[in-house]
């Protein structure tokens, strides 16, 4: 072999190794952030996100703070940006607290999406949304109304915090629907469990003790709903209607024992999966506009809606909402069909 030919082969080999290295480095990395870890609802969403990552050959990292805090989420966002992640999908604990960190991420070319709980729309590109506030707030009231069969009733709201975006939007719509359609219902209290199982149980027991003639607890939160059910069992209160949002695996024993007649949610595994599919499409094909559709394996087709479906005034190119195809009412007849 001549020296010239040897140098040529060596050069081609080096270029090939460099190309392989570049391809490895170019693999998409997507961060999927819950409000906090250790809660079944968020774990299920993370499972859906990671399932999508496998289907798309994308590296999906699921991580969140141990307590729901702006500082904890901001630290994770900054870490993922500094590590070179291509997209961040976050369930926001605050509508505006994450905005400075998310805007910095977007300025550095990172695709920013929200899921489950939104930020202000200018702080992200797309929100993967389980349902509009009107849909979910109405769902809460309708579930309660099917059990509270009287014109005058006492109702309590119980959920995670006074600042979390999604739940406060639903509750606002639910209270408006009560005022319009059930004017005889009195909302006697609105209390919070702050995503803590022990505090949630204590708060729920406190509500039931303080309002012994309570007709319904509306608990649109994955910790608050099972806490309300457990509190009713602990206090042997079988007269209060308990409705809200949580996962079927958590609520199954309460439904089977009859403590909870029905509750609602959406397929959070699908929500996680849809979130990653949308992020992947953005990274590979660029921004989507209102009306654009995306086919998702095992789910079907989703569509980009304007921010106005969530009640926002803000609209911009490359910005919108992707609604989940459906929401689910769980009861004793159908809960066995679901495992998440």
Swiss-Prot record:
Coiled-coil stretches noted in the UniProt entry, renumbered to this chain: none
Keyword Protein transport: no
UniProt xrefs under Pfam families: Peripla_BP_4 (PF13407)
Superkingdom of this protein's organism: Bacteria
UniProt xrefs under Gene3D superfamilies: 3.40.50.2300
GO CC, alphabetical: ATP-binding cassette (ABC) transporter complex; outer membrane-bounded periplasmic space
Signal peptide span: 1-26
Protein localization: Periplasm
Keyword Signal among record annotations: yes
One BP annotation, GO: transmembrane transport
GO molecular function: carbohydrate binding
UniProtKB keywords: Periplasm, Signal
Matches recorded under SUPFAM superfamilies: Periplasmic binding protein-like I
InterPro entries reported for this sequence: Bact_Solute-Bind_Prot2, LsrB, Peripla_BP_I, SBP_2_dom
Function text: Part of the ABC transporter complex LsrABCD involved in autoinducer 2 (AI-2) import. Binds AI-2 and delivers it to the LsrC and LsrD permeases.
Family (UniProt): Belongs to the bacterial solute-binding protein 2 family.
Subunit structure of this chain's protein: The complex is composed of two ATP-binding proteins (LsrA), two transmembrane proteins (LsrC and LsrD) and a solute-binding protein (LsrB).
Annotated protein name in UniProt: Autoinducer 2-binding protein LsrB
Organism of origin: Escherichia coli O139:H28 (strain E24377A / ETEC)
């Amino acid at each position: 072999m001549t020296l010239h030919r040897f140098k040529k082969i060596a050069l081609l080999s080096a270029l090939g190794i460099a190309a392989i290295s570049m391809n490895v480095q170019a693999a998409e990395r997507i961060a999927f952030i819950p409000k906090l870890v250790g809660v079944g609802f968020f774990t299920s969403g993370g499972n859906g996100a990671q399932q999508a990552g496998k289907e798309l050959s994308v590296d999906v990292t699921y991580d969140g703070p141990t307590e729901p805090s702006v500082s904890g989420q901001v630290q994770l966002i900054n870490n993922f940006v500094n590590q070179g992640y291509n997209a961040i999908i976050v369930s926001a604990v605050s509508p505006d607290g994450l905005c400075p960190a998310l805007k910095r991420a977007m300025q550095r070319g990172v695709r920013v999406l929200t899921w489950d709980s939104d930020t202000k729309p200018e702080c992200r590109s797309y929100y993967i949304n389980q349902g509009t506030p009107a849909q979910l707030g109405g769902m809460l009231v309708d579930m309660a109304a099917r059990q509270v069969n009287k014109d005058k009733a006492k109702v309590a709201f119980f959920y995670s915090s006074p600042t979390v975006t999604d739940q406060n939007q639903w509750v606002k719509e639910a209270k408006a629907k009560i005022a319009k359609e059930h004017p005889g219902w009195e909302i006697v209290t609105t209390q919070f469990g702050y995503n803590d199982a022990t505090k949630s149980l204590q708060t729920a027991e406190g509500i039931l003790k303080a309002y012994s003639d309570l007709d319904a607890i509306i608990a649109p939160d994955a910790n608050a709903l099972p806490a309300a059910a457990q509190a009713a069992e602990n206090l042997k209160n079988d007269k209060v209607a308990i409705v809200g949002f949580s996962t079927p695996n958590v609520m199954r024993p309460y439904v089977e024992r009859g403590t909870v007649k029905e509750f609602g949610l959406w397929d959070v595994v699908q929500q996680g999966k849809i979130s990653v599919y949308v992020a992947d499409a953005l990274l590979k094909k660029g921004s989507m506009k209102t009306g654009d559709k995306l086919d998702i394996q095992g789910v079907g087709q989703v569509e980009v809606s304007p921010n106005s479906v969530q009640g926002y005034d803000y609209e911009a190119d490359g910005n919108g909402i992707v609604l989940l195809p459906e929401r689910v009412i769980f009861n004793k007849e159908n809960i066995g069909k679901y495992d998440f």
